[in-house]
Amino acid sequence: VVRLRSPGNEENKIVFDDCIKGKIEMPENDEDFVILKSDGIPTYHFAHAVDDHLMRTTHVLRGDEWISSVPKHIQLFKLLGFKVPKYGHISPIMKLENGAKRKISKRKDPELGLDYYRSEGYLPEAVFEYLMTVLNSNFEEWRDQNPDSPIDDFEFTLEKMSNSGALFDSL
């Protein structure tokens, strides 16, 4: 394996402005971590930095389970001389199961696939409208004020996304 020798010190803090969660302060990464596995395949951390640099990615939006990796990613981008993208971490969509909440799963839950809604007779526009109410806190109010406007007129903003996971309630 190939490891990155971290020059970091966990007593130092990094601060970044998450596009969804706001200002986050964390200890700087001081852990040496694998960037190439023994089979020569890059780890997610290394691939993320190189691929996003080459693709000129400006914003990385991903699940909030990746927040703890941001110090590694910022360190890696800086050590490689790459511009650090803006990060936004999205809370998972939750589902009630046996009275408890759990993260909805693309493997376990058919309602995450569009084919499910097609087979149930939902119009694509209705599914899209529902998703917008889950994703952006001001969409429902906008729709009430603009019932005949095309959805493309709605100004989607990351700042209006919820900090906590929405509860998905299928009928």
Residue ranges and their predicted role:
Residues 68, 80-171:
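Catalytic adenosine-cofactor/nucleotide-binding cores of aminoacyl-tRNA synthetases and other
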Residues 1-107, 111-115:
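Active-site cores that bind ATP or allylic diphosphates and position pyrophosphate for catalysis
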